[in-house]
């Protein structure tokens, strides 16, 4: 018997997020990446969460803090509110609600996440860590100024 994927796609984990988590393949859409990141939090796979954050931000992420949060959180559901697959040629947005419990208290996290495609691979742009100055090069490596690239969508 196989287990359903925690991302609530309705597919078995082995046919859904597991190939992403094991880097056998990459998500083809920002929604797939967002679902796989949610699933990674459920499974406490913080390395995947970090590796799927835009490379320019990975060093700023506090792995211990993320791991502690994952350990203290019981994820109870995911709802995709909206997927905007083509905000630009390389950007996409996904709005979602993630339902969870901390200390038996039910909570909801709503987020409108930005994703960027670099060399054919989707990454999450984390707006909770320090972002470049608007006049500096974009953290995605596009060569554009931040304000004319990822910054325009945050």
From Swiss-Prot:
Pfam family, one: SEC-C
Coiled coil: none
Family annotation (NCBIfam families): PRK00183.1, PRK01617.1, PRK01752.1
Protein family: Belongs to the UPF0225 family.
Top-level division of the source organism's lineage: Bacteria
Protein name stated in the entry: UPF0225 protein Asuc_0343
Organism: Actinobacillus succinogenes (strain ATCC 55618 / DSM 22257 / CCUG 43843 / 130Z)
